[in-house]
Regions:
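Basic/polar N-terminal segments that are highly enriched at the extreme N-terminus
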Residues: 1-3, 301-302
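Active-site beta->alpha loop and helix N-cap motifs at the rims of alpha/beta catalytic domains
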Residues: 2-144
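General structural feature for long, well-ordered alpha-helical segments within catalytic domains
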Residues: 4, 23-26, 30, 57, ...
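C-terminal alpha-helical cap/extension of soluble enzyme domains
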Residues: 9-13, 37-38, 205, 213-302
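Secondary-structure boundary/capping signal
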Residues: 73-74, 132, 161-162, 186, ...
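Catalytic alpha/beta core domains of metabolic enzymes, predominantly
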Residues: 127, 138-252
Length: 302
């Protein structure tokens, strides 16, 4: 039976060997660690470096995360691509692998008119039996998806088939606009890395999709939000915000560099190797500030 998406659903970071291949042993360690921290599931997305993987690597990664999760939580696969045909191939592979949902950004190299956006997501929804997470990643790549496209998809397929991860700025007001335009029916997830999680939670999200590097903090924050414990909320939230603020200065590559640096420091990854080319490296002074903030987060979690 397909598991319902909800709660804390981190995005898997792809570890690489010295030879540049997917490090399957480390991937398994990462997934086991995520569930040990209290993740409700996991999936692949932009910070999995999907756009830098080959076709066969993307398919293999999807199969790995489904198999390695072993029923411990909901699993979803990022399937967005530059053509509908490509995206549908990835989506059908995810269903075959045993995933519980797929997540798709629209094509990133061109701004599509509304009817083409609707057709793209409809092809995915009609082509598989799984739920489709409609992702707007325009906070760092691509263009924003108009609210009317979200509403049209929800009206056609319903809230169990189509769910949303809107990341266009300003995220908070956009979440509320989608919530209100759908009468509260839309199931919405946020993916700000934690920096907007408190605001988003208060607007009624169903879950969050952070990176792995701060997962213990995000789980603690989510649980504090569920309890309504403001003291615990802000004690954990502030160091998370400060770390994510450093990631934001360099876009997607800023997130990747700091995320993998922290995964190495945690002993989860043997190296911070990323797929080239990328636009930003972590300098010594930023790394030192990340270390100071990470220590504060760990202290807040005691």
């Amino acid at each position: 039976m397909v598991k319902r998406l909800q709660g804390v659903l981190p995005i898997v970071h792809t570890p690489f060997t010295d030879g540049g291949e997917i490090d399957v042993v480390t991937l398994k360690h990462e997934i086991d660690w995520a569930y040990a921290q209290g993740a409700d599931g996991l999936g692949t997305g932009m910070v999995s470096e999907l756009l830098r993987l080959t076709y066969s690597e993307r398919i293999a990664l999807t199969h790995h995360i489904a198999e390695m999760s072993a029923g411990r939580g909901a699993v979803f696969a990022g399937v967005g691509a530059e053509s509908t045909k490509q995206a549908l191939i990835y989506a059908q592979a995810a269903e075959k692998a045993g995933c519980d949902a797929v997540m798709a950004v629209p094509p990133l190299t061109t701004g599509l008119p509304d009817d083409q956006l609707v057709d793209y997501f409809r092809a995915l929804a009609d082509g598989i039996s799984l739920p489709v997470i409609v992702q707007d990643a325009s906070g760092y790549v691509g263009k924003a998806i108009p609210l009317r496209v979200y509403v049209q998809l929800l009206e056609r397929y319903g809230e169990e088939k189509i769910v949303f991860k809107p990341e266009a700025s300003p995220i908070g007001p956009n979440l509320s606009a989608l919530r209100d335009a759908t009468g509260g029916r839309a199931r919405i997830f946020e993916g700000s890395g934690g920096i907007l999680l408190v605001d988003s939670y208060r607007r009624g999200i169903a879950g969050t999709m952070p990176g792995m590097e701060l997962l213990d903090g995000i789980v603690a924050l989510w649980r504090a939000l569920q309890r309504g414990n403001d003291e615990a909320i802000y004690r954990v939230y502030y160091p998370i915000c400060a770390i994510v603020a450093l990631q934001l200065q360099a876009g997607l590559d800023g997130f990747l560099a700091i995320e993998k640096d922290l995964l190495v420091k945690r002993g989860i990854f043997p190296s911070d190797r990323r797929r080239k080319p990328y636009a930003w490296d972590l300098d010594a002074e930023t790394a030192a500030e990340v270390d100071r903030l990470f220590a504060r987060l760990q202290e807040a979690l005691k």
